[in-house]
Amino acid sequence: MPSAPDAPAAPDAAASVAPNPPAALPVTVRWLGETPYDACFDAMRAFTDARTPDTDDEIWVVEHPPVYTLGQAGNPAHLLVADSGVPLVKVDRGGQITYHGPGQIVAYLLVDLRRRKLMVRTLVTRIEEAVIETLAAYNLASARKAGAPGIYVESGPHRGAKIAALGLKIRNGCSYHGLSVNVKMDLRPFLAINPCGYAGLETIDMASLGATADWHEVAQTLVRRLIAHLDGATAAAALPQQALEQSND
């Protein structure tokens, strides 16, 4: 009669313990209120140029007075009404022309990609996911569109309308610029441009789709989702409440 097989060895206790996830990297959230675009543009370039390997990443949340911005490869012909009264600022982000104004959340992501071991495409994907999840929190279905950066309404009579824009600049391995989400705003200035270079592209806001949340609530949701996609859900859940409170730093 063959002998019984040896019992399998008990696993090493140390080997059976899942490794701890890497510690979340600090992210400072700054609530800048309503700030002129030029001031933010100059400040984020200065911040990026001055940062060191030890500088914490930051997210700046802001609302701009009316302004058009044209990306570094942008075509000025996409501004259809030259005398609209809204200033045009040429900037160094990717993308074409877009509009910023009251009722829109703008979030600038000042992130050290090398320290986080992120490729640019990965960062863009995580930002897009954060926006999609933010909109879903208000029962708005949205999605990416191949070859057209930003987030678009996924269903209903406004299917295909753009509700969020995205454009980054990478300098010395660090990002600046970021994204915008239309909450409740005057959409007429978008009619004077080809948004992001697409003639006839409809632009929509959350209020027009039936969402009643205010700017501050949506901004807080967005910040949590951005941090969750940078550092994980645990880091987002642990974000202190004061980090989500409005202040002018």
UniProtKB/Swiss-Prot annotation:
It is an enzyme of class 2 (transferase). InterPro entries: aa-tRNA-synth_II/BPL/LPL, BPL_LPL_catalytic, Octanoyltransferase, Octanoyltransferase_CS. It comes from the Bacteria. Coiled coil: none annotated. One of its GO terms (biological process) is protein modification process. The active site is at residue 196. GO terms for cellular component: cytoplasm. Substrate binds at residues 93-100, 165-167, 178-180. PROSITE patterns: BPL_LPL_CATALYTIC, LIPB. It catalyses: octanoyl-[ACP] + L-lysyl-[protein] = N(6)-octanoyl-L-lysyl-[protein] + holo-[ACP] + H(+). Residues 53-234 form the BPL/LPL catalytic domain. It is found in: Cytoplasm. Keywords: Acyltransferase, Cytoplasm, Transferase. GO terms for molecular function: lipoyl(octanoyl) transferase activity. Signal peptide: none annotated. Pathway: Protein modification; protein lipoylation via endogenous pathway; protein N(6)-(lipoyl)lysine from octanoyl-[acyl-carrier-protein]: step 1/2. Its EC number is 2.3.1.181. SUPFAM superfamilies: Class II aaRS and biotin synthetases. HAMAP family: LipB. Catalyzes the transfer of endogenously produced octanoic acid from octanoyl-acyl-carrier-protein onto the lipoyl domains of lipoate-dependent enzymes. Lipoyl-ACP can also act as a substrate although octanoyl-ACP is likely to be the physiological substrate. In the reaction, the free carboxyl group of octanoic acid is attached via an amide linkage to the epsilon-amino group of a specific lysine residue of lipoyl domains of lipoate-dependent enzymes. This is Octanoyltransferase. The gene is lipB.
